[in-house]
């Protein structure tokens, strides 16, 4: 049983590190001073999709911010499932209202606070 608990803790740590890496990316789409981070975040997501088992990914450039597409075909006869989401976040202003630096996630008790 202790081996299972050790492995579970190792996996938890690994996944938390990956999540925190993502939460640290200041992908604020509404503020042009963060635009380079939108590209950084798109690339990060594309790589994570591949690591998670997607067969392929593509980043589509647009007049705005990039679109990240990932595909996993298990069987062409199966129905297509679309997962649509966004990877941008709200602007951190006003900074004086934050209890800790924005884009520096912390764990309080059992909750993750991406602040």
Please annotate each region the language model reported.
Residues 2-5, 9-40:
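N-terminal capping segment at the start of a domain
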């Amino acid at each position: 049983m202790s081996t299972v608990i050790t492995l579970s803790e190792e996996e938890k740590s690994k996944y938390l590190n990956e999540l925190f890496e993502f939460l640290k990316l200041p992908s604020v789409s509404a503020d042009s001073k963060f635009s380079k981070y939108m590209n950084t975040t798109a690339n990060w997501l594309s790589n994570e999709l591949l690591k998670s088992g997607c067969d392929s990914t593509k980043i589509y450039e647009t007049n705005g911010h990039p679109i990240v597409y990932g595909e996993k075909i298990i069987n062409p006869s199966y129905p297509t499932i679309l997962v649509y989401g966004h990877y941008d976040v709200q602007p951190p202003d006003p900074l004086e209202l934050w209890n800790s630096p924005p884009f520096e996630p912390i764990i309080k008790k059992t909750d993750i606070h991406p602040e």
